[in-house]
């Protein structure tokens, strides 16, 4: 593989997760593909369709021309409509069609990775006609694929890979979103701090500090007098941050100390993945 060193971790994480997805869905019988997942509105088939569709876009394939039905309750934004096209166009595909297409995409993307010579700053297409760097694209595919692997594992009752390479990509990306959640969305007061303490397969303690101008930043140093401390396990953190559960559903798995109103506001805005 000739991929640039700064892309290697993302390529490895993506490979690990998409191969796990292929292994998870290979033995499924037809009815199991229709099972609902924690991803709002999507079945097992829908998640695999989404993964396939996003990989075809990384390959530069043209998007399908397809009109969405009007009764999809979970489609509430332009971004969601964009994502739904690759899903809805495959809603009536059979199990063998799904596994065959996934296998073919894996082969094509693996070949692309082997021959990858573009720089991390190379600009590629992004959803909704936007642009992103190749590094951003690789990072987001590693993130997305691991999160959907976990959706499938929850649905199929096959837990695992909570500490795989993809998990670390997800951790870093979610942590980057914390300052906005705390300082802007939840409105934490100026010159305050919020501590997030996560245990389990992926462990970390981070402090979000809000400066005198109300801007947030995150670091690994503990705070002596935080306004709020949130403690939870890694799986719950991911499910909250990715909008798979509401705070009330996992209240027994999140320990809150300090300002209860601020903690509630933070948890209400904790989901950062687009919908």
What are these regions (language model features)?
Residues 222-275:
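C-terminal interaction segments
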Residues 203-229:
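Acidic/His-leaning functional-site neighborhoods
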Residues 167-211:
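A glycine-rich beta-turn/hairpin centered on an aromatic-Pro dipeptide
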Residues 26-37, 107-138:
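Acidic interhelical loop/turn segments
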Residues 1-9, 58-115:
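Short, helix-capping/interhelical loops that line the mouth of catalytic, cofactor-
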Residues 34-76, 127-183:
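Short, contiguous alpha-helical
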Residues 18, 22, 26, 55-59, ...:
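Structural signal for well-ordered, non-membrane alpha-helices
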Residues 2-45, 58-60:
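An N-terminal domain-cap segment
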């Amino acid at each position: 593989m000739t991929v640039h060193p700064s892309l290697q971790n993302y390529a490895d994480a993506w490979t690990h997760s998409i191969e796990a997805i292929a292994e998870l869905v290979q033995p499924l019988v037809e009815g199991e593909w229709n099972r609902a997942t924690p991803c709002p509105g999507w079945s097992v088939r829908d998640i695999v369709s989404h993964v396939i569709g996003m990989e075809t876009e990384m390959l530069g394939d043209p998007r399908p021309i397809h009109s969405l039905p009007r009764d999809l309750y979970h489609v509430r934004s332009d971004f969601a409509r964009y994502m739904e096209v690759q899903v809805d166009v495959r809603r009536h595909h059979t199990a063998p069609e799904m596994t065959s297409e996934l296998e073919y995409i894996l082969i094509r993307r693996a070949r692309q990775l082997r021959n990858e010579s573009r720089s991390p700053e190379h600009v590629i297409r992004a959803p909704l006609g936007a642009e992103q760097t190749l590094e951003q694209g690789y990072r987001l595919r590693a993130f997305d694929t691991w999160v959907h692997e976990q959706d499938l594992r929850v649905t199929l009752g096959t837990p695992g890979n909570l500490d795989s390479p993809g998990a670390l990509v997800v951790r870093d990306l979610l942590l980057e979103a914390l300052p906005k959640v705390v300082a802007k969305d939840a409105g934490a007061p100026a010159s305050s701090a919020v501590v997030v303490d996560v245990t389990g397969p992926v462990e970390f303690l981070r402090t979000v500090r809000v400066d005198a101008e109300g801007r947030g930043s995150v670091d690994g140093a503990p705070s002596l007098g935080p306004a709020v401390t949130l403690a939870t396990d890694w799986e719950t953190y991911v499910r909250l941050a990715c909008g798979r559960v509401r705070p009330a559903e996992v209240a027994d798995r999140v320990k809150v100390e300090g300002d209860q109103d601020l903690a509630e506001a933070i948890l209400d805005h904790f989901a950062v993945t687009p919908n």
